[in-house]
């Protein structure tokens, strides 16, 4: 029987509830956790826990590579990406790979390379995960003290936090370098309907970048989700990357202040709950971003936003009826308001009809027709370009509506197509995952606080039903 080198490892707040120190096995008798508690069995086995995390990373990267190649294999260049149920290729296209003017795909080879690179990486991670889970040392503290840790060692934990922050900062700078030096990224606002361009004039003004954080989250303001030019997005990544790297260096060099030592719970389960809370926030923000923002998520690849499809419909019928002789500036609708054009509460000229509620929308195909006071009547009469008509007609018929059975469009629409927008999928999935992560945050935070107070929340270990059932084997 293998006895661990030091008893200190068993004095952190997640106590083992069986009173034994032998960790030769990973069953309920030796760890206090049943098989379905997963990595909880590895709380004190830093080497095995490393294996679990590396293997998990391998699974994630394998999915990315395999799904990437699957999308490449099924991709039809003649159809827009958003009509093909793709969620990975739009991200690669947004980074400027394989696309040209108007978001047209001119080369799918970079997408193939991306998939293969992820598959190769996943094999390396998978090998590392299996090695550390099965063959490597159970604990790292004795052999590799730099990689070892004790959960309640506050200084070591903030050092690990610092390393993670530096890696996140470097990740932010990868996007900056791609946009500045390595071919640029796709700009949906480029003249004539979008193109790949290098970002030359970064927005680094703190009043602009941090002004987004001070905006209201509601219509017309839209908090950080309202960002609508790439200079601000890349400048924001410069700020964020710098803050993460400097914060990481700070956390590596310093020890937690007394107030932080008192205020926070210092245990593995507490760190899990903090991480789940942060990921939950990321999920909710990503949901809003992909649903409303057509700059970071260009409509050429992800399909139009909801407001964009609605405004596109109003625009399409304005174009049609104007050609048929309607005076779009003065025609009245059934409610007495303007049929095609009306005024917003603050006086701008906006599209009339039901789409009036989306008068905030900014989209690259529509902005050239605006003047200082909203939509410009003379431009609407003389200046509409064919590409704007084509794009709005396309967006009108591809609203991000749809159900789980992939029947797209408005429920009452008789000509509905079999289409569900990637925006619907990505927004819904990130909202749902963000919610589940939030519930997990509450669960683990409650357990961690209870353990710190000296008792345990959760399923009763001694009398849970499964213990009285016949073993599966």
Swiss-Prot record:
SUBUNIT field: PSII is composed of 1 copy each of membrane proteins PsbA, PsbB, PsbC, PsbD, PsbE, PsbF, PsbH, PsbI, PsbJ, PsbK, PsbL, PsbM, PsbT, PsbX, PsbY, PsbZ, Psb30/Ycf12, at least 3 peripheral proteins of the oxygen-evolving complex and a large number of cofactors. It forms dimeric complexes.
Gene that encodes it: psbC
NCBIfam families: psbC
Biological role: One of the components of the core complex of photosystem II (PSII). It binds chlorophyll and helps catalyze the primary light-induced photochemical processes of PSII. PSII is a light-driven water:plastoquinone oxidoreductase, using light energy to abstract electrons from H(2)O, generating O(2) and a proton gradient subsequently used for ATP formation.
Protein name, per record: Photosystem II CP43 reaction center protein
GO cellular component: chloroplast thylakoid membrane; photosystem II
Keyword terms, alphabetized: Acetylation, Chlorophyll, Chloroplast, Chromophore, Manganese, Membrane, Metal-binding, Phosphoprotein, Photosynthesis, Photosystem II, Plastid, Thylakoid, Transmembrane, Transmembrane helix
Top-level division of the source organism's lineage: Eukaryota
Residues recorded with modification N-acetylthreonine: 15
Disulfide bonds: none
Binding site for [CaMn4O5] cluster: 367
């Amino acid at each position: 029987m293998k006895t661990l080198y030091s008893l200190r490892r068993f004095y952190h707040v997640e106590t083992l509830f069986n009173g034994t120190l032998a960790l030769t096995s990973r069953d309920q008798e030796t760890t206090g956790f049943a098989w379905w508690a997963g990595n909880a069995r590895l709380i004190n086995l830093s080497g095995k826990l490393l294996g679990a995390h590396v293997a998990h990373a391998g699974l994630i990267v394998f999915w990315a590579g395999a799904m990437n190649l699957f999308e490449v294999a099924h991709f039809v260049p003649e159809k827009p990406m958003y009509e093909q149920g793709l969620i990975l290729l739009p991200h690669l296209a947004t980074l400027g790979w394989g696309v040209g003017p108007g978001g047209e795909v001119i080369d799918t080879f970079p997408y193939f390379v991306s998939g293969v690179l992820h598959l190769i990486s996943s094999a390396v991670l998978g090998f590392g995960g299996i090695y550390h889970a099965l063959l490597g040392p159970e604990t790292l503290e004795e052999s590799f003290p730099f990689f070892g840790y004790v959960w309640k060692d506050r200084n070591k934990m903030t050092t690990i936090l610092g390393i993670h922050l530096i890696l996140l900062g470097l990740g932010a700078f990868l996007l900056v370098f791609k946009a500045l030096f390595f071919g640029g990224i796709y700009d949906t606002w480029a003249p004539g309907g979008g193109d790949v361009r290098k970002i030359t004039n970064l927005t680094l003004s703190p009043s602009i970048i941090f002004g987004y954080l001070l905006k209201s989250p509601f219509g017309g303001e839209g908090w950080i989700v309202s960002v609508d030019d790439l200079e601000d997005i890349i400048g924001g990544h410069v700020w964020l990357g710098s803050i993460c790297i400097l914060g990481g260096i700070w956390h590596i060099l310093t020890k937690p202040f007394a107030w932080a030592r008192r205020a926070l719970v210092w245990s593995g389960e507490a760190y899990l709950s903090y991480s789940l809370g942060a990921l939950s926030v990321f999920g909710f923000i990503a949901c809003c971003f992909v649903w409303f923002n057509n700059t970071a998520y260009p409509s050429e690849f992800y399909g139009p936003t909801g407001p964009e499809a609605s405004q596109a419909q109003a625009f399409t019928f304005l174009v049609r009826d104007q050609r048929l002789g309607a005076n779009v500036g003065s025609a009245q609708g059934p409610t007495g308001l303007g049929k095609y054009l009306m005024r917003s509460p603050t006086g701008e000229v906006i599209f009339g009809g039901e789409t009036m509620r989306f008068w905030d929308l900014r989209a690259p195909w529509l902005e050239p027709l605006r003047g200082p006071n909203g939509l410009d009547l003379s431009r609407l009469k003389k200046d509409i370009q064919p590409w704007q008509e084509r794009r709005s007609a396309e967006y009108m018929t591809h609203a991000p509506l749809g159900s789980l059975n992939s029947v797209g469009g408005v429920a009452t629409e008789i000509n509905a197509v079999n289409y569900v927008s990637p925006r619907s999928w990505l927004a819904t999935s990130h909202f749902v995952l963000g919610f589940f992560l939030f519930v997990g945050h509450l669960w683990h935070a409650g357990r961690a606080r209870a353990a710190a107070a000296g008792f345990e929340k959760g399923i009763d270990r001694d009398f849970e039903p499964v213990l009285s059932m016949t073993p599966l084997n």
